């Protein structure tokens, strides 16, 4: 599993050299970006509370180093062609407690 999330409108760096930038440019870029990856498991629905579907991400690498070696549990909602993942508990982001959501729509098969 690999997740890459970037806030729209992240400012470009002044220089054109790859992986370069001022300390301020690099800090802004990191505040606008989150990536993590690792194995995932989907517990049996019979073993979860209220039959809520969950997915558990075992974080092996992350742009937020505090998550490395942890598990991140997400709530799964599937309705028709829509898949939504959300945090189980609120996260504190910029001093504000909030739940995060990611939504995907399954595209029709190309023929």
From Swiss-Prot:
Pathway: Secondary metabolite biosynthesis. It comes from the Eukaryota. Disruption phenotype: Decreases the production of 2,4'-dihydroxy-3'-methoxypropiophenone and but leads to the accumulation of 4'-hydroxy-3'-methoxypropiophenone. Residues 1-21 are annotated as: Disordered. Coiled coil: none annotated. InterPro entries: Lipocalin-like. 4'-hydroxy-3'-methoxypropiophenone carrier protein; part of the gene cluster that mediates the biosynthesis of 2,4'-dihydroxy-3'-methoxypropiophenone. The first step of the pathway is the conversion of acetate into acetyl-CoA by the acyl-CoA ligase ppsA. Acetyl-CoA is then used as a starter unit by the polyketide synthase ppsB and condensed with 4 malonyl-CoA unit to produce the pentaketide backbone. During polyketide extension, the polykedite chain is probably reduced and dehydrated by the KR and PT domains, respectively. This is 4'-hydroxy-3'-methoxypropiophenone carrier protein ppsC.
